[in-house]
């Protein structure tokens, strides 16, 4: 009887080990869901807005599709953002290799067994990044359950190839903060009119608070709810040792101060120049069949431009390492113009002054006399 019990126990244990091994193989081979290859893991974000810049480096505007993302490096991001992110989303971020067993176990017990759906999940920052980068939206609960182990494997792979700071930088560069503010650089500008390195502690906490649910904690739609969420982030920073209790109380009492200005590609500086550059850079090689009979002169001029002007059709003349042509909307190009922003500002002020003091009064006098 005892021998039979031991035999059964060992059989179950062996069966469990074999099943687990088979499941891991199935995940790594992509049999139960999409598994990115090494190249995709090493180059996870492949869509960035291109920038039009003045000769002195001032941003005139961007070209993008639905994701107006501009990459920002780790050293150009405020440390407040990193501290707030770790304190709120993954308190043991620096201690695990992609999977936090303690947080996962807590989530299973509280959410799965005790039904406490507000207890928080067990996903680490790395797992959240894996989900954002590689998991599509699940159509049902079963599909979402199958996505989880895939994200665990991807998270471990990400931890192998990136430092902790690089993982957080990828996370912040990828996240969609709504209002066409994709990535932390665009979000800092849209919500506060700043670069990521200039964000204050409360501003950083506001943006990190959105990471839980950007639609729910939208500072434009519901400022008070967003302020409360910001204060939760500040409280978490106290628990993590990044902020004193006195500072937390003082900062929590401050109102939510936004400098919100959504991106509109039809507004801003040098809009006509930006549109001209877009057309020139993305121009195709002229074909006579694409021109009407009476457009021969235009065809001739465009053909000469294609041959003699390196900028004309630049995206179609040049190829990336993979052999595909450049795309101004997704490849993160930097296009420097000959405009000097300071001289341009002086010139515009001079024109406005001349029109207001001289031309406009003369025009009014002739109009009404």
Predicted regions and their residues:
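N-terminal type II signal-anchor transmembrane helix
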Residues: 1-53, 92, 112, 354, ...
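N-terminal start-of-chain detector that recognizes signal peptides
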Residues: 21-26, 32-33, 43-45, 56-58, ...
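Short, contiguous pre-domain boundary segments
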Residues: 33, 62-68, 327-331
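Extended, non-catalytic substrate-recognition/exosite surfaces adjacent to catalytic cores, especially
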Residues: 215-369
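Short, flexible segments with low predicted structural confidence
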Residues: 6, 13-16, 24, 57, ...
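Short aromatic/hydrophobic contact patches that present stacked aromatics
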Residues: 24, 71, 336
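Peptidoglycan glycan-strand catalytic modules in the bacterial/periplasmic cell-wall system
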Residues: 46-244, 249, 257, 265-272, ...
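Coil-to-alpha-helix initiation sites in intrinsically disordered, low-complexity, charged segments
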Residues: 3-4, 124, 140, 305
């Amino acid at each position: 009887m005892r021998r039979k019990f031991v035999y059964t126990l060992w059989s179950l244990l062996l069966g469990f080990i074999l099943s687990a091994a088979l499941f891991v193989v199935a995940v790594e081979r992509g049999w139960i869901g999409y598994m990115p290859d090494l190249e995709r893991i090493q180059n996870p974000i492949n869509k960035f807005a291109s920038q039009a810049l003045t000769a002195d480096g001032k941003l005139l505007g961007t070209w993008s599709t639905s994701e107006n993302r501009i990459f920002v490096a780790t050293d150009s991001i405020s440390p407040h953002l990193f501290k707030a992110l770790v304190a709120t989303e993954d308190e043991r971020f620096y201690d695990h290799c992609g999977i936090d067993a303690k947080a996962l176990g807590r989530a299973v017990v509280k959410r799965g067994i005790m039904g406490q759906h507000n207890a928080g999940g067990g996903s680490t920052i790395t797992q959240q990044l894996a989900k954002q980068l590689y998991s599509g939206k699940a159509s049902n609960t079963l599909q979402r359950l199958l996505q989880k182990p895939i994200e665990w494997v991807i998270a471990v792979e990400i931890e192998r190839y990136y430092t902790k700071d690089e993982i957080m930088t990828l996370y912040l560069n990828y996240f969609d903060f709504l209002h066409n503010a994709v990535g932390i650089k665009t979000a800092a500008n849209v919500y506060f009119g700043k670069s990521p390195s200039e964000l204050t502690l409360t501003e950083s906490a506001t943006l990190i608070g959105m990471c839980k649910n950007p639609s729910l904690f939208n500072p434009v739609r519901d400022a008070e709810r967003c302020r409360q969420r910001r204060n939760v982030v500040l409280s978490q920073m106290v628990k993590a040792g990044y902020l004193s209790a006195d500072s937390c109380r003082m900062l929590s009492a401050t109102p939510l101060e936004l400098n919100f200005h959504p991106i509109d590609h039809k507004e801003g500086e040098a809009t006509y120049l930006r549109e001209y550059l877009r057309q020139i850079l993305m121009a195709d090689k002229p074909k006579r069949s694409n021109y009407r009979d009476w457009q021969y002169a235009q065809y001739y001029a465009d053909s000469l431009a294609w041959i003699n002007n390196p900028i004309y059709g630049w995206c179609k003349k040049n190829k990336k390492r993979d052999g595909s042509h450049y795309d101004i909307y997704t490849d993160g190009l930097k296009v420097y113009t000959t405009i000097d922003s300071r001289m341009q500002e002086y010139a515009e002020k001079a024109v406005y002054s001349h029109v207001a003091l001289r031309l406009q009064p003369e025009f009014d006098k002739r109009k009404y006399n």
